[in-house]
């Protein structure tokens, strides 16, 4: 007989939902993970794979701390998943760089990083602006167009697909229930008493977590929540495999464990259009070749686009329902970077029944001017 009662239901089987479900199950909560399947706009399959700190949180120190915290949690999460599942996530954290192709870019980047450091306050932020011979010692093969770069020791990268597989395997291995092809067809909400209809079944739990990416916009009001998220298209190019040549990732280029180079970082307002633009692809390739001219000798073997989950201010939304306690929402566009905090910090809060006070700046109420005032 199919189990229908759980301690928690997580809606959304991508990187965000899987990390939270894994964390809840590890906390001892019998958790159901509902995954809509391939009809969903799968942001996870298009994730670039950076574990990135240095470009996050300008004007939002709480987000900078949350991101740094996740980078710190990542080694523990990766080691635990490897031990429990035998699946490596490909995590490497050698630091990372943002390349600047003009003096103007370098100057603006220096100002950006200095402001991030000031906003970090006592929390601190270690970074360096690197030029010339030192930059080329750190990254052999840099092109003459590269004026310099910013570096921080916190950054790294991992495989989004290996991570997703490890989280799912770790979740079910710990006793979690995974239901694929389970689009939410109906629901009801009362304080600490929720029911969800999916895959022809009705499930109940005192906690429900909305982690369905762009689908949260429609789901949230059913549970007394708001998720004003919109799609932002990003495109990625992938080269053939080559010898290991990049000792650390950049904002727009990283080398996978298998040897391929991933090139990306486009940001497009294209609605829900998952198509690809030759002009955008040309710009991605052009910047990559200006950064490392030897990339021009590699063949491109794959290209795709995916939709990021973006709030109006670009920051994550984490919220709990005042009307229906026990209902939570998690929305972000950094499912790989934030996997550490989602599994190791956010999930324990949800298990305890409430978000910690320090999470208040992430609430969607920040978009309601009257409430924020």
Residue ranges of model-derived segments:
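Active-site substrate-recognition segment that forms the wall
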Residues: 19-26, 36, 47-51, 86-92, ...
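Dinucleotide-binding Rossmann-like beta1-alpha1 core, especially the glycine-rich loop
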Residues: 49-134, 138, 287-289
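Short, well-ordered coil/turn residues at beta-beta hairpins
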Residues: 12, 198, 211-212
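Helix-loop-beta segment of a Rossmann-like dinucleotide-binding subdomain
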Residues: 87-101, 126-174, 266-270, 325-332
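C-terminal catalytic lobe of FAD-dependent flavoproteins
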Residues: 292-373
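Helical element adjacent to the flavin cofactor pocket in flavoenzyme catalytic cores
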Residues: 150-206, 215
């Amino acid at each position: 007989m199919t189990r229908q009662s759980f301690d928690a239901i997580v809606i959304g089987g991508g990187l965000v939902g899987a990390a939270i479900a894994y964390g809840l199950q590890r906390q001892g909560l019998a958790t159901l993970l509902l995954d809509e399947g391939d009809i969903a706009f799968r942001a996870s399959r298009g994730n670039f794979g950076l574990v990135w700190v240095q470009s996050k949180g300008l004007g939002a120190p709480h987000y900078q701390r949350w991101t740094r915290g996740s980078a710190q949690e990542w080694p523990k999460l990766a080691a635990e998943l490897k031990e429990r599942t035998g699946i490596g996530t490909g995590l490497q954290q050698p630091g990372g760089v943002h390349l600047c192709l003009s003096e103007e870019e370098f100057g603006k980047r220096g100002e950006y990083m200095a402001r991030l450091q000031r906003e970090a306050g006592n929390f601190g932020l270690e970074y360096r602006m690197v030029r010339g011979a030192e930059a080329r010692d750190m990254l052999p093969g840099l092109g003459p167009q590269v004026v310099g770069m910013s570096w921080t020791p916190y950054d790294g990268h991992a495989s989004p697909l290996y991570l997703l597989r490890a989280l799912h395997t770790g979740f079910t291995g710990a006793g979690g229930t995974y239901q694929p092809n389970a689009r939410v067809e109906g629901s009801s909400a009362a304080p600490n008493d929720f029911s969800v209809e999916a895959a022809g079944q009705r499930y109940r739990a005192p906690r429900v977590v909305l982690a369905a990416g762009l689908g949260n916009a429609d789901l949230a009001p059913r549970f007394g929540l708001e998720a004003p998220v919109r799609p932002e298209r990003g495109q990625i190019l992938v080269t053939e495999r080559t010898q290991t040549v990049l000792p650390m990732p950049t904002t727009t280029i990283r080398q996978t464990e298998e040897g391929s180079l991933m090139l990306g970082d486009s940001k497009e307002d294209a609605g829900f259009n998952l198509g690809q633009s030759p002009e955008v692809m040309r710009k991605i390739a052009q910047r990559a070749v200006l950064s490392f001219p030897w990339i021009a000798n590699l063949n491109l073997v794959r290209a795709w686009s995916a939709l990021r989950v973006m709030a109006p201010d670009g920051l994550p939304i984490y919220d709990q329902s005042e009307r229906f306690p026990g209902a939570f929402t998690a929305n972000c566009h950094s499912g790989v970077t934030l996997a550490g905090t989602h599994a190791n910090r956010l999930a324990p809060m949800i298990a305890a029944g409430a978000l910690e006070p320090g999470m208040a700046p992430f609430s969607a109420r920040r978009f309601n001017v009257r409430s924020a005032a």
